[in-house]
Amino acid sequence: MKTFVAKPETVKRDWYIVDAEGKTLGRIATEIAARLRGKHKAEYTPHVDTGDYIIVVNAEKVHVTGKKFTDKMYHAHSGFPGGIKSISFDKLIQRKPEMVIEAAVKGMLPKGPLGRAMFRKLKVYAGAEHAHAAQQPQVLDI
């Protein structure tokens, strides 16, 4: 019996919607990352993008434990000397709430072209409205 290897053109991708309201950031991010990779499917193949599309709504209402709301920092560097910029979680959740979930999930995906392709299937929205009603997403309870 030969080992099954999924082909990119034969992979069936579904659309799922996740409500992040009141959910813990890390717990929701791990499940989203696993779904984006396709690890929940029987035809999972490590070098093929077999994951589904994930829509996350209410990103502004995500929850963190402990003192992370004030103490957690996000860093970015411009590439120039002294070009590091830091922003705390509470300021980032006010300014760009989508970025909080995107950063958490992106760190859990593979680095490289395959990981970037998986990350493109993640759609995050700050409020309850999203632009993917035509795809008829199924509710994913995490």
Swiss-Prot record:
Keyword Membrane tagged: no
Keywords tagged on the record: Ribonucleoprotein, Ribosomal protein
GO cellular component terms attached to this protein's record: cytosolic large ribosomal subunit
Domain of life: Bacteria
GO MF assignments: mRNA binding; structural constituent of ribosome
TM region(s), chain numbering: none
Pfam families per record: Ribosomal_L13
Database matches in InterPro entries: Ribosomal_uL13 (IPR005822), Ribosomal_uL13_bac-type (IPR005823), Ribosomal_uL13_CS (IPR023563), Ribosomal_uL13_sf (IPR036899)
GO biological processes: negative regulation of translation; translation
Subunit record text: Part of the 50S ribosomal subunit.
Alphabetized NCBIfam families for the sequence: rplM_bact
The protein's role, per its UniProt record: This protein is one of the early assembly proteins of the 50S ribosomal subunit, although it is not seen to bind rRNA by itself. It is important during the early stages of 50S assembly.
Family, as annotated: Belongs to the universal ribosomal protein uL13 family.
Record's protein name: Large ribosomal subunit protein uL13
Organism of origin: Aeromonas hydrophila subsp. hydrophila (strain ATCC 7966 / DSM 30187 / BCRC 13018 / CCUG 14551 / JCM 1027 / KCTC 2358 / NCIMB 9240 / NCTC 8049)
Gene that encodes the chain: rplM
